[in-house]
């Protein structure tokens, strides 16, 4: 399986949606439950977030093997987030 990295902020509502989507998808799918996800809180772990800095603006952003596969956008619904996280999981499992 491929390495998944999620850049997020603790107080970001879109990041809470992404965490909820991850939990929901992992509970529904055994293959997704096996995925190892590195969560980087960019305000507390700037040294870990820095290598990704030029590749994203909004959080949450999901990277698979260093390539951005998802970046939230203002006004995004939970359903959009869920679909994007599931798409990222499918890429990670392929």
Descriptions of predicted regions:
Residues 18-22, 30, 64, 78-79:
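Non-catalytic interaction surface on structured domains
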């Amino acid at each position: 399986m491929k390495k998944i990295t999620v850049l997020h902020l603790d107080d970001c509502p879109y990041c809470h949606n992404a965490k909820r989507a991850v939990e929901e998808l992992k509970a529904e799918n055994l293959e997704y439950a096996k995925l190892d996800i590195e969560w980087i809180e960019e305000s507390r772990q700037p040294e870990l977030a820095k290598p990704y800095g030029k590749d994203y603006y909004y959080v949450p952003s999901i990277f698979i093997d260093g390539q951005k596969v998802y970046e939230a956008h203002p006004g995004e619904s939970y359903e959009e987030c869920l679909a994007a996280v599931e798409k990222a999981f499918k890429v990670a499992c392929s």
